[in-house]
Amino acid sequence: MNFFPTHNETGKSIVRRHSQALLQNGHLERSRQLRNLAIAAELDCPKYLLAPEINQLLQFIPDLHQRTLIETLWNTGARIHEALALTKGDFYLDEETPFVVLRTLKQREPKSSVTKNKVKIRPKRVVALFDPQYVQLMKSYFATMRLKNQSQIWPIQSDNTVRNWLRSAVEQAEVNGISYVVEPITCKTFRHSFAMHLIFNGVPLKVIQAYLGHKKSSSTDVYTKIFTLDAMLHFDISFR
């Protein structure tokens, strides 16, 4: 299959079409190979898991409290401290298009605009929740826990706790003969995986930038680096 156009296209449309083609039948394995090649060559690309790998790993997190947090990282691309700050009221699960409101914690205001007495207002962003199973999981969790709208969902003091959950899940996977090329698997792995999953499914980079809370598009563009490795398959170029 030729992923590259014979007519004029923008760079973004090429990335979108190319990435979608990689996830079609027979190309999921190619996506895996590209990722593994980038890791082996120690390229400056975000390390991510593919959807089947994440769903496999989630099976080793049976605790519902832990599972809902990890699934939230995967389904929203939230930074760990953004996820830990979430309340029940931040989720809008009964809408025609379910979504969650995240408070962006990474962006910083210019020093000139910060004063001693100024109340820091965290910018908010909306992230669509595409997976119906995740939406149903959160609905069931909220019904079970009977949380108030302003109650923190995961009152965890340190993200080290979450790292320990993930470490335990990976160890359980290894006991069952399953290993992952990405190591260590951290909270940030799910953020990278979320971004790559959206790119593979053709979501525009500008939308992904908004979902991730990136101020600069260059921060999002880093996720397209992996596709440079695939160019050699589609151009017959000789230097002889």
Could you say what each language-model-derived stretch is?
Residues 5-11, 31, 225-240:
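DNA/chromatin major-groove-contacting recognition/catalytic segments
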Residues 30-55, 110-132, 147-149:
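DNA breakage-rejoining catalytic core of tyrosine-based enzymes
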Residues 51-80:
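Basic, Lys/Arg- and aromatic-enriched nucleic-acid-binding interface segment
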Residues 86-137:
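Conserved tyrosine-mediated DNA breakage-rejoining catalytic core shared by Y-recombinases
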Residues 91-93, 184, 203-224:
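Short, polar N-cap/turn motifs at the start of nucleic acid-interacting alpha helices
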Residues 108, 212, 216-237:
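Catalytic-site neighborhood detector that most strongly recognizes the C-terminal catalytic loop/helix
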Residues 159-160, 180-201:
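Short basic/aromatic active-site micro-motif
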